[in-house]
A protein has these predicted regions:
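Acidic, serine/threonine- and proline-rich low-complexity intrinsically disordered segments
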Residues: 5-6, 35-120, 131, 136-275
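Accessory beta->alpha helical hairpin/"wing" motif in late/C-terminal subdomains of nucleic-acid enzymes
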Residues: 6-34, 40-43, 114-116, 122-124
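Short linear motifs in exposed loops
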Residues: 127-128
């Protein structure tokens, strides 16, 4: 995930990370900086996460807006190791920098009681009265896993605009297409799902699924639910029953299944089933 290894050896990035001597995630964030402003921002984030605020405020954005002497000193040390002498820390760069090193800790709210699901599938939680708990999406780089609860406690997090983050970091998103049977309408429906790890970012109708996907989904739906899911007209139902009897009485013929598939596809092409 951090790009530190190539096979069983350190990659070029891994060697840079090791030279910094930081926590691997923080080192990955630091070496990912592409310019001086990103480096200055990453250095300040790292300083805050190494020595988090003790006032109980879990908002990383609030902490970042402060200029604590210890954080400034540590930031300068890290920038010196990176051979960076300029640059300004910029709050608009925090989310994409964090996402590169803590993608598995992107979190989406589940319920109104401060509970979140992380992209890695784990649960996490804030106090229900924490101001951050009003927001649907967070990145939570600092967690505490206790023994009393299956959910980790979020110690420090940043609220994020998920659409903006996806636009700036498209590599975070996996895309999958699904064609499935809709029981309510008796038709096939196709969806495109965008996910970050185990979190669904967006689900949207898929306009033109492949014929193979349609065919397989149709077969799966009929196999699971039976032929009754096809919304037969009275005439078509009578024909189906007659063919069922014919297949029972004349088992040596194999025309029944082929004919049924042909009938269905003709109905589908005429628009009886809509995607």
């Amino acid at each position: 995930m951090l790009g530190a290894l190539e096979g069983e050896r350190l990659s070029a990035q891994g060697q840079k990370m090791a030279a910094l001597g930081n926590d691997p995630r923080l080192a990955a964030m630091l070496v990912s900086a592409k310019n001086d402003d990103e480096a200055a921002t990453a250095a300040k984030i790292a300083a805050i996460l190494e020595e988090p605020p003790r006032m109980g405020n879990s908002d990383l954005g609030v902490a970042f807006s402060r200029n604590q002497p210890a954080w400034q000193q540590r930031s300068q040390q890290l920038l010196k190791r990176l051979n960076v002498r300029g640059g300004e820390a910029d709050s608009s760069l925090i989310a994409p920098l964090l996402a590169g090193a803590f993608a598995d800790r992107i979190a989406r709210r589940r319920g109104q009681d401060g509970r979140y699901q992380l992209a890695n599938g784990m649960g996490a939680m804030l106090d229900a009265n924490d101001a951050l708990s009003r927001h649907e999406w967070l990145i939570a780089p600092l967690l505490l896993q206790g023994s009393a609860s299956p959910d980790a406690r979020i110690l420090l997090a940043l609220l994020v605009d998920i659409d903006e983050l996806v636009q700036r970091c498209p590599q975070l998103v996996q895309q999958s297409d699904t064609v499935e049977w809709d029981d309510a309408q008796g038709t096939l429906k196709a969806w495109r799902r965008l996910q970050i790890g185990q979190l669904t970012v967006k689900v949207q109708p898929l306009a033109k699924p492949s014929e193979d996907e349609l065919h397989q989904a149709m077969l799966n739906g009929i196999r699971d639910k039976g032929l009754s899911v096809l919304n037969w007209t009275a005439e078509a139902e009578q024909l189906r029953l007659r063919l069922l009897c014919a297949a029972k009485w004349l088992p040596e013929y194999d025309w029944y299944q082929r004919l049924m598939m042909k009938v269905y596809w003709q109905r589908w092409k005429r628009g009886c089933c809509h995607i």
